[in-house]
Every structure is written in C-alpha cells, then in structure tokens.
Regions:
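P-loop NTPase Walker
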Residues: 1-106, 111, 211
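Solvent-exposed alpha-helical segments within well-ordered globular domains of core cellular machineries
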Residues: 53, 66, 70, 74, ...
Length: 239
C-alpha cells in the first residue's frame, strides 16, 4: 500500500489527517479536492482502523462514485467494501432496502426510472382518455417534481389503508398526479424524487432508525457539497 500523503500538498495533508469536527475544503476546479477526499477515506481506514462500512462518501453521479471507488481501492486494495461510496440516491436506496418495511413497502421495492414513469403515466392517460405526447410527458414529470418538493405525500403512500379517492382537484394535472402516486403504491415503486423523501420521512417518523444510521456512520464526506439542494442538505444534517 502506498504512502497516503506522498502525493499531497500541505493543505491537502491538513484536510486528509483531520479527524474531528467539521472539515470544509474550499478550492477551485482541478485543484485536488476529490483527491483529498479519497485520501482522507483511505487515511481513516488505514491509520485509524475505521471500517469502510462506517464511512459514507457522497458524490453526485455514478461515474464519479465509480472513479472514487477505483482510487480508494488502488490505495487500500480490492478486498475493501466501498459500497458506501455512492450517490445520495444510491445511499437512500440502501437505507430503504433495510428499513422500508416500516412504511408497509417490501424490501424489494422497484426503483422507477424515466421509462417506468412514462409507462405509469401512459396508463393514467389511457384511463382519463387523454393523449400523451413528448411535451405533455415532460410537463408532467416537472409537475411531479414540483408536487414532490413537499414531503407530505409520503404519508399517503406509507399508509396501506389510505383512500386515494379523497384526493380531488379541478386541475387535470393534479388528477393525473393523484392517479400516478396511487399506481406507484400499487406497484411498490419509488421514483428518484421519492428515494430522498422517503428516507427523510423515515428518519423523522422513526427516531430509532435515524439513531441506528447515525451510530453506523462515523464519518460522512460529501464531494461537491456546494451543489446539494436544501432537501439533500436536510438529510445529511440529520445523519
């Protein structure tokens, strides 16, 4: 295993070897922030014996996560589990696979991609006798995103006895949305908006679950922290 600080400058070494409290690294593009983050991960494992299963390392794309895993394994070896080096959506999926039964969903719930969302919307449009084209699909995805900025809808989906007929509106887009989430529940499907919302709702509703994950995660590191949303920040703060 290589010496973890050989390729680092003094500022990077300071960030890598700091182990207590909040650490904020401010630097421009291409200055080695990600290098410092991956080396800090390796430093915690090698020098302090922290298990990789106790370190959460968040990045924003699967490509970036895979690159970080590659760098970490180059320093530590292939045997180390880097499954907690992931996007926030992937991490939330991991949490929900363990905990979502509390919300009356099966652990093998479906993660809905754009194709799945379109199929569900096509079903809704057929039921309502509406023609769906590319423009209307994009519009409804934007409406779903807007609607799901509020987490209150999760309580409907988490209640197996919820009566969806109580959700009414004169706006066609609202009616489509209500039918969409009803079908989501029928298929036990969560879209990308739901993954974070369900995790926040779960942590808020079941303090013992939040405490479990807070205890498990000794260190949390976030790449490109300046790009996170307010909701993502709320989730990270809870942890």
């Amino acid at each position: 295993m290589q010496n973890l600080t050989d390729s680092l400058n003094p500022s990077q070494i300071e960030a890598v070897t700091a182990t207590e409290g909040y650490i904020r690294v401010i630097a421009g593009a291409g200055t080695g922030k990600t290098r410092a983050l991956t080396h800090r991960y390796a430093w915690l494992v090698n020098e302090y014996g922290i298990s990789p299963s106790n370190i959460l390392c968040i990045t924003f794309t699967n490509k970036a996560a895979n690159e970080m895993k590659k760098r970490i394994k180059a320093m530590l070896g292939e045997a180390f589990d880097t499954s907690f080096v992931a996007t926030l959506h992937a991490f939330c999926t991991r949490v929900l696979r363990e905990e979502i039964s509390r919300l009356f969903y099966p652990e093998n719930f479906i993660v809905l991609d754009n194709v799945d969302q379109k199929k569900i919307l096509e079903e809704v449009y057929d039921e309502m006798g509406i023609r769906m084209d590319t423009a209307s699909f994009r519009f409804m995805i934007d409406q779903i995103r807007y609607y799901k900025n509020l987490i209150t809808y999760v309580s409907y989906l988490a209640d197996p006895d919820f009566d969806y007929d109580t959700l009414t509106s004169d706006k066609p887009s609202d009616e489509i949305m209500f039918r969409y989430i009803k079908k989501q529940r029928k298929y036990f499907g969560l879209d990308f908006f739901d993954l974070i919302n369900f995790t926040i709702y779960l942590f808020r509703t079941f303090p013992e679950v939040l405490e479990k994950w807070q205890t498990r995660l000794c260190y949390i590191m976030v790449d490109e922290f300046q790009d996170i949303t307010a909701k993502e920040f709320k989730l990270i703060r809870r942890l």
